[in-house]
Amino acid sequence: MSCLRIQAWWVWLAVGLLAGLAIGGLVPDTPLHAFATDRVDNIALATGPVDWQEGIEAMYFLDFDTGSLKAAVVSNATKGFQAYYAVNIRADLMAAAQRAGVQLPSQPRYMMVTGLVDIRRGGASQKLPARGAIYVAEANTGIVLVYVIPWSPQAHASNQPVVDSLVLWASDRF
């Protein structure tokens, strides 16, 4: 009797494993994307996608004191960075605050995260909006600025150095 229970247990385990494998084979794979953000004192650092289909990401660096937002993309051919992007967010933040009718504090408090975006990309242009965005929020006012990298897949593929500005894609108060 005890021997039959042990054998039945193995049979059910085998049936369950086979059923799980069969169902798992029918369900399409779901890609997972992980990005990182960290801060210390008045500096924030984040990683985010540029062209996630190609596995390319950028490093973003925000200096809270100066409002300087910089991004860099690692070269795929040599050691070092291949592309650099920068913008000072203060002018964009001031313009968004004026539109929202709010006063900016003397000491802005920033938060920064990255994410995937689905922006229409025309094929004719050399520079396309990246597939990722950097979101910078000012915590006192609720204003969020969204920046994208003007991405050139051709420049990256040929390891051509790039120095350009980040593009303000959207801004609003929440």
Predicted regions and their residues:
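Hydrophobic membrane-insertion alpha-helices, especially the h-region
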Residues: 9-25
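Short, low-complexity cationic-aromatic patches
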Residues: 38-66, 117-141
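A low-complexity, Ser/Thr/Gly/Pro-enriched, surface-exposed linker/loop concept
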Residues: 24-35, 76-113
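A compositionally biased, intrinsically disordered/low-complexity signal enriched
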Residues: 45, 59, 70-72, 112, ...
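N-terminal positive-inside, membrane-proximal cytosolic segments immediately preceding the first
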Residues: 1-11
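Short, solvent-exposed interaction modules
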Residues: 93-143, 149
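N-terminal low-complexity/intrinsically disordered pre-sequences and tails
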Residues: 6-8, 171-174
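Extended intrinsically disordered, low-complexity coil regions enriched in Ser, Thr, Gly, Ala
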Residues: 64-94, 140-172
